[in-house]
């Protein structure tokens, strides 16, 4: 059995409802509904969730670990939330959050306006910092990757949009 799939999930104050092939996790920050693969059994035992494969097949074993990680992320998301921090490096690079839009000036001839999907918010504590928050880990990471994709850090000066924990390795310039 999968090592990840064996460990139980502590609910940390989240409510869980199991109904017809789906699990609904409700917490103080919101609600997430996730489909459960039929190869995985889910049992709710007084504040913890236990997952087990239906049979001993390799696919069921792998899916039990995957489903456990997805459900654990849902529990974490509705109780504490997820956030991803981005930093803008470069002269004149600015960011400003306005409602559900993120306005970026990244050295192009036009400003870049990124529309935030439902359930994801962007904050700009300073003009060169962006904090993307939400309850869905996959969605927060996807939005952060899309914003970074407008101007990824270039390898010679390091200018661009980078994750705050990202280390950009700079290349040496060509010598004559």
UniProtKB/Swiss-Prot annotation:
Biological role stated in the UniProt entry: This protein binds to the 23S rRNA, and is important in its secondary structure. It is located near the subunit interface in the base of the L7/L12 stalk, and near the tRNA binding site of the peptidyltransferase center.
Domain of life: Bacteria
Keyword Cell inner membrane applies: no
Protein name per Swiss-Prot or TrEMBL: Large ribosomal subunit protein uL6
Record GO biological process: cytoplasmic translation
Stretches that traverse the bilayer: none
InterPro entries given in the database record: Ribosomal_uL6-like, Ribosomal_uL6-like_a/b-dom_sf, Ribosomal_uL6_a/b-dom, Ribosomal_uL6_bac-type, Ribosomal_uL6_CS
Subunit details: Part of the 50S ribosomal subunit.
CC terms in the record's Gene Ontology section: cytosolic large ribosomal subunit
Any one GO molecular-function label of the UniProt entry: structural constituent of ribosome
Pfam family, one: Ribosomal_L6
Membership in a protein family: Belongs to the universal ribosomal protein uL6 family.
Annotated keywords: Ribonucleoprotein, Ribosomal protein, RNA-binding, rRNA-binding
Gene3D superfamilies linked: Ribosomal protein L6, alpha-beta domain
């Amino acid at each position: 059995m999968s090592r990840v799939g064996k460990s139980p999930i502590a609910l940390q104050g989240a409510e869980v409802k199991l109904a017809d092939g789906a699990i609904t996790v409700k917490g103080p920050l919101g609600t997430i509904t996730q489909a459960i693969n039929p190869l995985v059994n889910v049992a709710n035992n007084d504040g913890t969730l236990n997952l087990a494969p239906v049979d001993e097949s390799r696919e069921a074993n792998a899916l039990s670990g995957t489903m456990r990680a997805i459900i654990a992320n849902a529990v974490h998301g509705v109780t504490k939330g997820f956030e991803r921090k981005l930093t803008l490096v470069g002269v004149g690079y600015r960011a400003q959050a306005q409602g559900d839009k993120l306005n970026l000036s990244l050295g192009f001839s036009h400003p870049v306006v990124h529309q935030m999907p439902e359930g994801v918010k962007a904050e700009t504590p300073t003009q060169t910092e962006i904090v993307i928050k939400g309850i869905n880990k996959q969605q927060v990471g996807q939005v952060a990757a899309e914003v970074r994709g407008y101007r990824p850090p270039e390898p010679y000066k390091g200018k661009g949009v980078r994750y705050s924990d990202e280390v950009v390795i700079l290349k040496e310039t060509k010598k004559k």
